[in-house]
Amino acid sequence: MSDEKNLGVSQKLVSPSRSTSSCSSKQGSRQDSWEVVEGLRGEMTYTQEPPVQKGFLLKKRKWPLKGWHKRFFCLEKGILKYAKSQADIEREKLHGCIDVGLSVMSVKKSSKCIDLDTEEHIYHLKVKSEELFDEWVSKLRHHRMYRQNEIAMFPRDVNHFFSGSSVTDSAPGVFESVSSRKRSSLSKQNSFPPGSNLSFSCGGDTRVPFWLQSSEDMEKCSKDMAHCHAYLLEMSQLLESMDVLHRTYSAPAINAIQVPKPFSGPVRLHSSNPNLSTLDFGEEKSYSDGSEASSEFSKMQEDLCHVAHKVYFALRSAFNSISVEREKLKQLMELDTSPSPSAQVVGLKHALSSALAQNTDLKERLRRIHAESLLLDPPAVPKPGDNLAEENSRDEGRALVHQLSNESRLSITDSLSEFFDAQEVLLSPSSSENEISDDDSYVSDISDNLSLDNLSNDLDNERQTLGPVLESSGEARSKRRTSLPAPGPNTSSVSLWSILRNNIGKDLSKVAMPVELNEPLNTLQRLCEELEYSELLDKASRIPSPLERMVYVAAFAISAYASSYFRAGSKPFNPVLGETYECIRQDKGFQFFAEQVSHHPPISACHAESGNFVFWQDVRWKNKFWGKSMEIVPIGTTHVTLPAFGDHFEWNKVTSCIHNILSGQRWIEHYGEIDIKNLNDDSCHCKVNFIKAKYWSTNAHEIEGTVFDRSGKAVHRLFGKWHESIYCGGASSSTCVWRANPMPKGYEQYYGFTQFALELNEMDPLSRSLLPPTDTRFRPDQRLLEEGNIEEAEVQKQRIEKLQRERRRVLEENGVEHQPRFFRKSSDDAWVSNGTYLELRKDLGFSKLDHPVLW
């Protein structure tokens, strides 16, 4: 015990880059920051089993709950279990279980907080007294090193979470927790496919056979699970023998049971010896106290039976799941490579004929509507009483009428990617590409070529008649690019841990990162990406019912997150103070511009105008690194006005989290609640909940929303996945309000960019003369990264950052405060456009201004 006290917290919790001989001022500042607790390194070993630590701690409630609650914790052999009380721990009625050896542990001495970051959750713990804090940190450190040494010595035990020589060492709750984590990790590899070799699609994609043929990890997993299955069958026989022995000891003649001569200690059953040959009933020695030994031995048998049965059934279930999944994938590969049977060809021909006839009918309807719209003033406003389904099926002939099968709500949310039989609204030409199932992929290709090209042209023509008239000078483009000049760099050689280990719990927006970790877009351009589906606002501006308008505004707010699904592997450039960006899109009918209005704190403001809507927001992000994951917390409000009805909508943003920062396949999720209000009309409001993924569930990226009327009654319900599609209605009758555009070819090589994102940094000679020199497209480090010149991009990035620091120092020395050029601060501290950007652009006014040197 004295040895443990000598391992002082201040000596052992120092970050690897810090010296233990720091002066007192540095020690004081260290107490105010998060520090990582080091584990075993190199050839270090730790074989001494630490004592069990128990007691009450404060644990932060899991999202969405807030505050702290009191829980009883038990730390034994590197496993931290917790429940409401000690009695619940003893009864194995656990609330959770953490493998400390596999977690990243960080502490903050000033607030007496301990954070344990696993792959699935971040556990925030707090200790009331400093003495208890030091004691728990010391014990956690010892148990963590002991557990890491055990993992290093017996790596197989990490997968199965119990030792072959002592099954009773694993509590049932412990195994269930880890077993579910392992099953979850397998499901997540299918649920979060960005950039992963495990991603696949059913439609002749060659990635499917490649994944099956090169899946060494799955082969190893199958072999390991088969070994476990055989071993657990042997354990089952052992349990039956023990059960017989238990009934024997429970008989009245318990004192007559004999044991072998050399036996002098308590009975110990070895799980690797199922025949119980160490017991000999032929000797004449008996227990000195038979009833007491019988009671203790019976209790041990009951505990062992309870744990072993849970282990057996859990692993058998996992084994069956993996076997079934692999068989499905093998069948998929066989179907993918084998010729289609004649019956299938006949069915596909019928489907093709039906699709062509339907598309021809739709094309004729759209032509008539387009011809009528040219003869009329602004489109006639439908009657207010029409509901959303009637509007979608009637408005401009855009509905593809397919009846949704009468399935349960659960079956819909299980796989929305296969939910193509719903009644759907064509919001963009690319939306229809997903209307036919993957098995009919070649039918989709043919029908697209024959009719959907004409259909999309009609839709574009109709949009232009309704959209604003934009200046044509410098905006004519032949064709937008479909790829970047060079693919993204290989970042496997970048050591994120060496960069982030000293920044646990800190705001990462102030931490310099290597240019390889960036994508060739910056935050201002990311704000413009939120307008990729601006047609939802165009649609809302033509709907008379405020309740139905709210549905499309909510869908627009959700669609802003769709492009992030494939973008977890890189981060955007941070804009420098005074940097600007513009995006004029005639095809979408809006004009967008943005400016970095503040550097400390970093605030980006943007504004967009259209004949149908006005969009603006100012936002800043706080990034928190927690060891294995990073949270991105946005601060700011998004505004949209619809002049046709005098609506002014505003809403907040939700929290984003990138998982597996240091190792494994990174994936992103969004969670929290968006509250959408109409400031000029209180007849309705909307709440959209981004559901946090649970490691025991395969459902991820789901949203649920409700539109309420003035009395609080739910009028419309929204559901779907934020990266796929949004539906309005119930399980038996729903309307597809929005569907994400398909990804461009080769998107994995180009940072996971959508087609819209690929075009954001594009610059042609005509638009070059219209842009101010502060526009992001002139930024050299970002342009060099896009072109694949990593070394020169890093040099330019450091030069630009140094130049910004010098500008800030000069401003501070002269007492000058930076004044944004195109935005002003309103009375509620929000940044809004001052109306000068678009006016200056008309008359080439940017060339007449003095601009700061940003790069």
UniProtKB/Swiss-Prot annotation:
Phosphorylation is enhanced in vitro by phorbol-12-myristate-13-acetate (PMA), forskolin and calcium ionophore A23187. Phosphorylation seems to be stimulated in conditions of low cell-cell (or cell-matrix) adhesion. A motif (FFAT 1) lies at residues 161-167. This is Oxysterol-binding protein-related protein 3. Keywords: Cell membrane, Cell projection, Cytoplasm, Endoplasmic reticulum, Lipid transport, Lipid-binding, Membrane, Nucleus, Phosphoprotein, Transport. The FFAT 2 motif is required for interaction with VAPA and regulation of the endoplasmic reticulum targeting of ORP3. The FFAT 1 motif may contribute to VAPA binding. The PH domain binds phosphoinositides, with a preference for PI(3,4)P2 and PI(3,4,5)P3. The PH domain mediates targeting to the plasma membrane. Residues 15-31 have a biased composition (Low complexity). A motif (FFAT 2) lies at residues 450-454. The lineage of its organism: Eukaryota, Metazoa, Chordata, Craniata, Vertebrata. Expressed in spinal ganglia. Expressed in a subset of small lymphocytes (at protein level). GO terms for molecular function: lipid binding; lipid transporter activity. Belongs to the OSBP family. Residues 50-145 form the PH domain. It comes from the Eukaryota. GO terms for cellular component: cytosol; endoplasmic reticulum membrane; filopodium tip; nuclear membrane; plasma membrane. It is found in: Endoplasmic reticulum membrane; Cytoplasm, Cytosol; Cell membrane; Cell projection, Filopodium tip. It holds the Pfam family Oxysterol_BP. It is a peripheral membrane protein. Residues 1-32, 274-293, 377-396, 468-490 are annotated as: Disordered. The modification Phosphoserine is found at residues 15, 33, 199, 250, 272, 277, 288, 291, 340, 393, 405, 408. Its main location: endoplasmic reticulum. It comes from Mus musculus (Mouse). InterPro entries: OSBP_sf, Oxysterol-bd, Oxysterol-bd_CS, PH-like_dom_sf, PH_8, PH_domain. Transmembrane segments: none annotated. Phosphoinositide-binding protein which associates with both cell and endoplasmic reticulum (ER) membranes. Can bind to the ER membrane protein VAPA and recruit VAPA to plasma membrane sites, thus linking these intracellular compartments. The ORP3-VAPA complex stimulates RRAS signaling which in turn attenuates integrin beta-1 (ITGB1) activation at the cell surface. With VAPA, may regulate ER morphology. Has a role in regulation of the actin cytoskeleton, cell polarity and cell adhesion. Binds to phosphoinositides with preference for PI(3,4)P2 and PI(3,4,5)P3. Homodimer. Interacts with RRAS. Interacts (phosphorylated form) with VAPA. Interacts with OSBPL6.
